Structures are given as C-alpha cells and as structure tokens.
C-alpha cells in the first residue's frame, strides 16, 4: 500500500513519511475545565489569563461562539438584578444605594473591559500550540525545543550516501559508480573502492562523463539520470524527466559515448518523443525501450530502431507495469528482463481492456502540461486511470519472450498454471543456458507456484507449489529478492540453484534450492530471528550468503553470513548491541556499504567482508551535524517494551517528554500504521512529527506494532487475514487501557492518529472503542472500505469481496453511532490521491450525514496525491495535526449537548466587541 511499502519493506515513509532523548517543558495542561460551576468573575479572570497566555498565537479558523464552558449558564445576569428589593422590605439607605450602584458600575466596567481585552487578545478556537510555564519540568532546561519546521525540513535528517556498486567488466569487485562528489574529477566516474582513498592516485578511476550537460544538434541535454553500459563505453542518459506515478516516469533518452564525450538520441528518428523505460543488454550492445506502451530495440551497431511490438496502447502495455503492478507488485517501473547472454528479452504483456477506470480530477493544476481547449479553461483536468478495485476485473498478464537473433516474439505454455483471470506474475529471474524462473500466485495471493521455462526448447513446467493458506492461513508477499546460484563444480556446486525466502517453523527463513527443479530446499537459517528482504549479497567464490535479520528483538536489524551448506553462521555486525543496520554489497560481495541507522547518530562506512583476505574500512559519513544538534536540543526519551495481549507479545515504543516527571499527568497520543507485515516500532534514529509532539508539545507518544505487523511471527501475522482492523484495533485499545491506568497518564486526554493504512486503523480503533478509551482521532488519507482499494493489495489480505463479503462489511468504517461517541475526530485527504481515492472519505462523510453525526472536522487538499504535498499542503497537514491535537487536549473540542442561545448582557458585550474587532480588521 502506497507510502506503506516503505513500512512493509523496512524502508524509511513511511512516509511516508517515514519514514533522540529528553526535553524541558511538558504538555499544555494548565487550563481548568471545571470552570462551568465557577463564578462569573473567576471565569472572566481565568479566561483573561488564558488569553494573555495565548497572546501572539496565529488565528487558524473561526471562533466557536457556543464554547461556553467558562460560563455558568444556569444564572442570568441582568443590570436590574442589583436593584431588586424584596417585597415588604425596608427601603435601602441612600449612601448604601450609591455605594452599591458604584460597585455595580465598577464591576460592569471591569467586566466590559475584561471582555474587550478578551476579544482583542484572544484568538480562535483553532490554536497554535504553546508551552505553559506551569509545565516546565523540575529538572530544568536541557536545551532548545525543536520546531515543526525543523522536523519537516532537512535539519534533522541523517546524511545518507547512496553507493551504486558496479560489476567490473573483467570481473573486478569493489567498483562503485559516483556522481559529482566534492573534490571529484568529472561528473560521472567509476572508482575502485580501495584505491580511491589515495587522492594522489588515479588508479582504478574512470571518468565516464566530464560534465552533466552535452549538446546534440544544437539542443542542450541536461542529465536527470544515467546508466553506464556494463562495458563502461557508453552511458544511457535520461533528460527532462517527468514523474508519472510513484515509481514511473517519462523522459528523453540519449546515448553518450565515453571516448568522444558526445551524445546522440536513443531513437534518432523520434528524438523528441518521450520514452517510458530503457535498459541495457548485459552484453552492452543494445538497449530495449518502451514508448507509448510499445517495445523497441536499438542496437549500438546501427542507428535504426527495431519495432518489437506495435499493438500497444491505452489497454495494452508491453515491458512496463500498469498502475496496480507498479504499486503493489514490482514497486518499480520495469516489467522487462534481459537474459544474461543478451539473446533474449522477457517482458510482460498487460491487457487492461476489462479494467474499470477511475477519474482523478485536478482543480488547480494541469499535470498533463497541455492547455485546455478554448472555452474549457474553467473546467478541472481529468485523468482516467485503469484501477482495479477489490472484486473488479484485474489486468491479464502474460510473460512473453523476444528472440533477438530471430526477431520474433513467443510464449511458452506451462501446464497447470493459473488461468488468465486468476494469475499474478510477481517475479521473473533469468538463470543460465536459456532457463528462467517465474514466480506466480493466484489472484488472492495464497497459492504460490514456481515455473521453470527453457526458452531454447520453448518448454516449461511447474517445479514448486506451496499452498500458504493451507499452511498457516496466510499469504504470499510479492518480492524480487530471489538469487540465482550458478553451478560451479570446483566449489562443490554441481547444479544450478537459487536462494529464496520460505516459511519455516513459523518464520521467514532462507533456503537453497538446487537443482532448479528441486522442490525440497536446504534451510540455511533457523531460529527465532526472521530474515528481511534477503539475501542481501552472495559471494560465489567463497560460497557465502549475506543477509539481514530482525535480531533477538524485532526492532533490531543485524547482518549475518552463512555458507551454502547452512554451516558457519556468523554475525557481521556487533550483535551484543541493540542496533539497526542495513547493508548493500559489491557485485562479488567482497565489500559492503554498512549503514548504522540507530538508535544513536547514524553513520556509514565501507568495509571489506570478513571473508575478504584484504581488510579495508573507510568511514564515509558520521553525521557530525546531528551530534552537535543533539547537544543543543532536548528530545524525547524512548522506552521499548512488550505488552502481552491474548498471548501475543507486542512491541511497544513509548516516547516520553524530556525531564519526564512520573508525578505529573500527561496526555497520550497513539501513533500507528499497522498494515500487514509492516513495522513502526524500530531502533532507527529519527526526529519526526512524533518527536515534536513528545519533545515540544510535551505529550507522551505510544506506538504499538499489533497483530498483523511484521517480524513477530507468522501466527500473529496470518491472524488478521479476512478481517482487517479487527485484531489490530483491539490491540491498540487494550494497550491504551493499560496506559490509561498508569499514574502519569491523564486518561481523559487520549488520542490516536495515522496516515493511509494508519488512517484506516485510526478510524477503526475509535469505531471499535466508542469513546471509552480514546477521546480523539486524526486520520489522514484513510481507507474506509476495502472494496474501494486496489484488488491486488485488498484481496491479498481480505480475499475477494465475492469470497468474503462479511469480512468486507465488518472491516468497513460504518458504525456511525460509535464514532459519535468519541469527543471529536479529524479526517484529511488529497483530492488527487491516485492510491487511496478520496471516494473513501466522501462515502464516510455521507454515512455521517445520514446519521446526523457532526463531531468531526474535515480538511481537503486540492490536487494533492497520497503524499499530500501540493501547494504547501505537506506543511499544512502537519500544522493542522499539531494544532488540532493541542486544541483537543486543551478541551477545545468538548461537545455541548443541545446548545441554546445565550442572550445575556455579557454575550451581547462579547458579540459587540467581536463585531467591532471585525469591522476594524476589515
């Protein structure tokens, strides 16, 4: 799911979005919410004090004039009340009467002045957060507080160098591709990792491009991306890149000759036409590319372009994925695979003719870049995308092959494979001698087959089949991490094979299959730890596999190696420390870029692997700027722990405000994502929105990786299938109850928030909870009914709606009565969200309207996609989250049942002052 692949694949976004320790102030909890029974004078004074405290706050929205909790509405105050004489009583003495009248007028004058000051100094109900002096911890200040701008900008982002390891043309290991670094020579270079430390030596360094610009026929080409050929003689250049969806883009492509430092169009006959994808042959003699959904071949020996397909168009795609395959299967823009010998190309043919379209409207922008027709300037631009929702027709995909020598396309029939309407192709892996492995699943992603195809004989067969639903009730995640292991009799490998991730004893483990058609593997890893996106590297000479595991604790990541026979399991990183690493390996796995991601300040270094006879180490990033900032700022402290719910040990992260005082009462915000296989509780360093909430606003932030999330076992993972939201919401609520019972938690101020799947989980949790534990919720870009989400993702975890209608009904956000029992909730969505359509939010609003539910706020972001970043929207969404949360915990959203007009003198004075203020501001 969207920004969520990052989570499910252990990436940064989160999010999106992805994706420290200790502070100086606590939460804003100085307001007294019991003032409804206080006297008018105390109420006014209290309100003025709070107004003074709020002075300088920016106005965010209209004031709610029905917010009367500072007033005693049971008492009517009128000027005549002071002159009331009981019947039959003695006339009042004149001097006493004068004194009383004087006191009355002084009181009225004071009250009127107080109201005027209140109106002119206070601000709207929608407030910007500030810190109360009452909440400064007794421990004193430990440093500056971070701002929202700090966490939304790049000040706290670790610097991260991306090294592109490059296989040497002559088998060299440890070569890397670098672009325009400090003190470098040339825009694009290939360098030997060992010799580059010697700045006086040019050994092992090849300059491929001196500059990032060149001229072709009078046109200046500016490089957007570059891909050197395997022989390092030519560079494939992309210019004028234009983003399409999350991973796909178009642009102009060029061939740049390294010797002459000159360029030419990839297709000289169509220089200005935009291309969707281009990739090198392993022999460096040709480039295959897709344009207008058709495939073409350019051999470097000729300027002519060979047409491979010609019937591609709106409904038929060749070599590139459609929207749903790009998003949910490949997480990329390519569906083209070169054979190692350069004689064949495998590619997907995608038929979308039966897939329904969904319209994306753009009200402000025109992403097409085209001017509207005359008279249509005031109409929104509409882009129709082929988007298969759950239960709708899927694109039909076929694997086809192109024989370059014969110039023909062919397919290979495989007996007993899935039929067209029940087939997903999720990985294609070339082996040797014309063999290719194809990983397929059924539509619901719970039966896996591996087919072996021989393109030389044009035959194929199924070599492995696994029923995951029967095994543990789970599903198959699409991955592209399988590694081919070629035969090498001199190294005790008589047959070809491959290394894959399999389910073993309830965990994801590595397995070695050899020969290719052997369905019974050798299990390489065992035990409590689970492998993550592995294998990461393979050393064919030494017979070693390198991989990353979620270590002794699920929030850790460590790097290990093991031999092909399953022996000599060794850690590469220091497993005695609770840390989070990731790694990338050189082509021969003799060197590695080791990334320490946390919990301390991240660093990067290039190392030789333990099996390398020539030890090497070079630190390339220490993030000293973050070390300096940590000495100046106060950040939250983090507490990692487990909470047992229904027999499952769930990872929990509690962020505590700096100078945490266990004798105080803190509001609590739960932050979650919670999607299947995802992880949010980890030991990566990060200063994000949650850090701001804990460190600057002074609230406790709790994150729970509940059932269905990753790296806590398949039993927990598979349990959620067919009923998304049920167990996950229960876990959030049960953990929240435990936190509400803690002596340092204010149980009357608890909120929950999330984005995308986390938005769905926010609404599901407050729906299930019905206001008993969580009073507030904030949902960004939420799914509200899985029938509205794309078929491949939704059906993987929910089956089809036809197969599981009750599950879809139960998972949908539909209990409006329960939502009405919360104090208030917030929903935000981008109108141009191509991933989680705004249809989700709009249909929920319709349900709320029909049920007369109004305890919510909505913010819609015009033309923003799932990331919500168009026209300042990224900053606005987090500002709104922060301000709304502060108002919630300040009690600004407390409901008033059956509000009635208040026509008292003081309300009239307040109204008059407000009108006066409005008149003069205008």
UniProtKB/Swiss-Prot annotation:
The keyword Phosphoprotein is annotated on this UniProt entry: no
Keyword annotations: Aminopeptidase, Glycoprotein, Hydrolase, Membrane, Protease, Serine protease, Signal-anchor, Transmembrane, Transmembrane helix, Vacuole
Pfam families for this protein: DPPIV_N, Peptidase_S9
Top-level class of the enzyme under EC nomenclature: hydrolase
Organism of this sequence: Ajellomyces capsulatus (strain NAm1 / WU24) (Darling's disease fungus)
Comp. bias regions, Basic and acidic residues: 1-16
Top-level division of the source organism's lineage: Eukaryota
Protein name: Probable dipeptidyl-aminopeptidase B
Database matches in InterPro entries: AB_hydrolase_fold (IPR029058), Peptidase_S9_cat (IPR001375), Peptidase_S9B_N (IPR002469), Serine_Prot_S9B/DPPIV (IPR050278)
Disulphides: none
GO biological process: proteolysis
Residue positions with a glycan: 135, 200, 351, 574, 815, 902
Membrane topology recorded in Swiss-Prot or TrEMBL: Single-pass type II membrane protein
Region of interest: Disordered: 1-21
Active-site residues, Swiss-Prot/TrEMBL: 756, 833, 866
Stretches assigned to the Vacuolar side: 121-922
Family that this chain belongs to: Belongs to the peptidase S9B family.
Protein task: Type IV dipeptidyl-peptidase which removes N-terminal dipeptides sequentially from polypeptides having unsubstituted N-termini provided that the penultimate residue is proline.
GO MF annotation terms: aminopeptidase activity; dipeptidyl-peptidase activity; serine-type peptidase activity
Cytoplasmic face residues: 1-99
Localization per Swiss-Prot or TrEMBL: Vacuole membrane
TM stretches of this protein: 100-120
């Amino acid at each position: 799911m969207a920004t969520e692949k990052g989570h499910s694949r252990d990436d940064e976004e989160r999010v999106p979005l992805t994706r420290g320790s200790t502070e100086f102030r606590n939460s804003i909890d100085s307001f007294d919410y019991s003032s409804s029974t206080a006297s008018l004078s105390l109420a006014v004074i209290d309100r003025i004090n709070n107004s003074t405290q709020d002075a300088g706050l920016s106005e965010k929205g209209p004031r709610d004039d029905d917010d009367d909790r500072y007033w005693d509405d049971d008492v009517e105050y009128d000027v005549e009340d002071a002159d009331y004489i009981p019947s039959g009583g003695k006339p009042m003495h004149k001097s006493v009467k004068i004194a009383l009248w004087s006191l009355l007028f002084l009181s009225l004058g004071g009250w009127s002045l107080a109201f005027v000051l209140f109106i002119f100094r206070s601000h709207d109900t929608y407030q910007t957060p500030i810190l109360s002096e009452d909440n400064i911890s007794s421990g004193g200040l430990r440093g500056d507080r971070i701002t929202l701008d700090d966490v939304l900008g790049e000040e706290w982002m670790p610097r991260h160098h991306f090294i592109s390891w490059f296989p040497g043309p002559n088998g060299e290991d440890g070569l890397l591709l670098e672009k325009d670094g400090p003190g470098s020579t040339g825009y694009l270079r290939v360098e030997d990792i060992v010799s580059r430390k010697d700045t006086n030596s040019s050994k092992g360094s090849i300059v491929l491009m001196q500059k990032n610009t060149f001229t072709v026929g009078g046109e200046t080409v500016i490089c957007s991306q570059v891909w050197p050929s395997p022989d390092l003689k030519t560079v494939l250049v992309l210019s004028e890149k234009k983003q399409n969806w999350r991973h796909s883009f178009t642009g102009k492509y060029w061939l740049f000759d390294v010797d002459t430092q000159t360029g030419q169009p990839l297709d000289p006959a169509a220089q200005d036409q935009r291309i969707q994808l281009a990739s090198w042959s392993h022999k460096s003699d040709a480039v295959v590319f897709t344009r207008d959904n058709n495939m073409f071949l350019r051999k470097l020996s000729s300027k002519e372009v060979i047409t491979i397909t010609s019937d591609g168009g709106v409904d038929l795609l060749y070599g590139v994925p459609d929207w749903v395959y790009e998003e949910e299967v490949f997480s990329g823009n390519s569906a083209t695979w070169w054979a190692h010998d350069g004689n064949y190309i495998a590619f997907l043919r995608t038929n979308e003719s039966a897939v329904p379209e969904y319209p994306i409207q753009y009200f402000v922008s025109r992403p097409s870049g085209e001017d509207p027709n005359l008279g249509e300037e005031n109409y929104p631009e509409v882009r129709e995308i082929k988007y298969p929702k759950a239960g709708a027709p899927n694109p039909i995909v076929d694997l086809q092959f192109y024989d370059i020598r014969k110039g023909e396309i062919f397919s290979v029939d495989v007996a007993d494979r899935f039929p067209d309407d029940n087939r997903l192709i999720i990985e294609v892996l070339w082996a040797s001698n014309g063999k290719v492995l194809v990983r397929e699943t059924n539509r619901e992603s719970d039966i896996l087959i591996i087919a072996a195809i021989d393109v030389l004989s044009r035959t194929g067969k199924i070599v492995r089949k696994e029923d995951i639903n029967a095994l543990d009730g789970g599903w198959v995640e699409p991955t592209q991490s399988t590694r081919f292991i070629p035969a090498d009799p001199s190294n005790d490998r008589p047959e070809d094979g491959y290394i894959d991730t399999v389910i073993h004893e309830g965990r994801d483990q590595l397995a070695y299959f050899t020969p290719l058609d052997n369905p019974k593997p050798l299990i390489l890893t065992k035990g409590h730890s689970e492998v993550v996106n592995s294998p990461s590297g393979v050393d064919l000479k030494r017979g070693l596999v390198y991989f990353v595991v979620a270590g002794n604790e699920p929030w850790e990541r460590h790097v290990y190696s093991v031999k092909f026979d399953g022996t000599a399991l060794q850690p590469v990183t220091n497993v005695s420390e609770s840390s989070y690493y990731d790694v990338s390996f050189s082509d021969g796995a003799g060197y590695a870029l080791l990334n320490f991601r946390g919990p301390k300040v991240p660093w990067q270094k290039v190392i030789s692997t333990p099996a390398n006879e020539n030890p090497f180490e070079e630190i390339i990033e220490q993030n000293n700027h973050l070390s300096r900032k940590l000495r100046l700022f106060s950040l939250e402290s983090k507490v990692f722990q487990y909470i047992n719910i229904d027999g499952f040990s769930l990872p929990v992260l509690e962020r505590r405000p700096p100078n945490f005082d266990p004798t105080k009462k803190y509001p609590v915000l739960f932050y979650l994502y919670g999607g299947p296989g995802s992880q949010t509780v980890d030991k990566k360093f990060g200063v994000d929105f949650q850090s701001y909430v804990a460190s600057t606003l002074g609230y406790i932030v709790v994150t729970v990786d509940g059932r269905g999330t990753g790296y806590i076992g398949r039993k927990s993972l598979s349990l959620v299938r067919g009923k998304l939201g049920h167990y996950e919401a229960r876990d959030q609520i049960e953990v929240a109850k435990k936190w509400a019972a803690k002596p340092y938690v204010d149980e009357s101020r608890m909120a929950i928030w999330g984005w995308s799947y986390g938005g769905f989980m926010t609404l599901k949790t407050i729906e299930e909870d019905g206001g008993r534990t969580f009073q507030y919720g904030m949902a960004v870009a939420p799914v509200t009914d899985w029938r509205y989400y794309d078929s491949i993702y939704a059906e993987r975890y929910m089956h089809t709606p036809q197969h599981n209608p009750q599950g879809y009904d139960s998972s949908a956000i539909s209990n409006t009565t329960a939502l009405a029992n919360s104090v208030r909730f917030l929903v935000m969505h981008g109108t141009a969200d191509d991933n989680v359509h705004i249809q989700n939010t709009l249909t929920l609003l319709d349900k709320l309207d029909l049920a007369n539910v109004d305890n919510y706020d909505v913010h819609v972001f015009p033309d923003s996609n799932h990331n919500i970043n168009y026209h300042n929207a990224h900053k606005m969404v987090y500002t709104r989250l922060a301000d709304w949360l502060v108002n919630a915990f300040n009690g600004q959203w407390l409901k008033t049942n059956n509000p009635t007009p208040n026509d008292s003198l003081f309300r009239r004075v307040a109204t008059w002052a407000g009108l006066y203020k409005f008149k003069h501001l205008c």
